[in-house]
Amino acid sequence: MSTISDFNTAAQAGIDREHEVQLSLLRTLCQAIREQRSTSEVAQLLGHFSDYCEAHFVSEELIMRQHSFEEYEDHADDHCHLMDLLRVIATDWETADSSSLKASTDEALAFIENHISTRDKRFADFLHRAE
């Protein structure tokens, strides 16, 4: 029979893998933009990354709510901010605003790396203590 500790450990490992996938997808998107790949390829990568983030954020926020994580609102606000950045990237791509596009992709990458190393780490530590 599984325990809450087993669930927490599995949830934390799953979330960590999802963070690795998120970073990989975003780096691939940034590279495609830098290399000025086709509109359809960039649109597909952006859509895939956006969809992945939405699914990840829903699952992560559900676990936070289940555990009454005290930093939930600030953490969820970060998720909203990243989704806003993705909309900016999409607009910059569609309007061919290359200087703004470079700035927005750089900002998104720096933001998610910082988010994972700070907020997500605190959440992982919280889950670990909850075991």
Cite the ranges covered by each PLM segment.
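Small-residue-biased structural context
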Residues: 1-131
